[in-house]
């Protein structure tokens, strides 16, 4: 845990960092929301939620079970997407070394907004997954087993039709290892 010093007139920020190879960490936010932060991830949030929103910043992967507060939307900001919820359970994967940002909804509803020059908003329903590729600016929505995909909180890995490169990156992150393989050979697998 690291508490970042900020000027007195602004909120104090808290940084939760989980290194590569470490178990996921469970934290509770000032509003009572529950968050699981995965390996090689950083979550930054204020020590109190002042103002009109509850805004957090994520680089990596985290699972959110949001306390309902219709007057203060809960917003997770990543490099390429903003994900907004009022009271719901969802997962966000947004590693800086991956071109994809993925939002997966378990319960409730979330609004996903791209940060393109022409922003795009999508409302997800349970078991829908929004995938945004920052290199191609492509968007897709898939139907998934959202509960299974968030089993990383319990240390389990689940892959279904995942590209080989994603499988390798996930294992490297979880176990803090480097896997050497012919990337060109497995590029489209």
Regions inferred by a protein language model and the residue ranges of each:
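A residue-level detector for the "anchor" residue at the start of short, highly conserved motifs
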Residues: 1-189
């Amino acid at each position: 845990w690291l508490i970042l010093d900020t000027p007195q007139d602004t909120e104090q920020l808290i940084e939760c960092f989980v290194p590569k190879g470490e178990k996921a960490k469970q934290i509770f936010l000032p509003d009572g929301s529950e968050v699981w932060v995965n390996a090689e991830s950083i979550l930054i949030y204020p020590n109190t939620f002042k103002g009109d929103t509850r805004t957090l910043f994520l680089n990596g992967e985290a699972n959110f079970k949001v306390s309902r507060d219709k007057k203060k939307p809960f917003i997770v900001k990543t490099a390429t997407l903003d994900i907004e919820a009022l009271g719901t359970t969802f997962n966000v994967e947004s590693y800086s070394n991956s071109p994809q940002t993925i939002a997966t909804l378990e319960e409730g509803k979330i609004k996903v907004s791209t940060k393109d020059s022409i922003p795009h908003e999508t409302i997800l329903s349970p078991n829908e997954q929004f995938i945004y590729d920052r290199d191609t600016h492509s968007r897709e929505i898939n139907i998934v087993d959202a509960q299974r995909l968030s089993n990383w909180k319990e240390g389990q890995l689940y892959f279904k039709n995942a590209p080989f490169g994603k499988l390798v990156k996930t294992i490297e992150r979880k176990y803090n290892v480097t896997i050497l393989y012919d990337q060109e050979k497995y590029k489209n697998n």
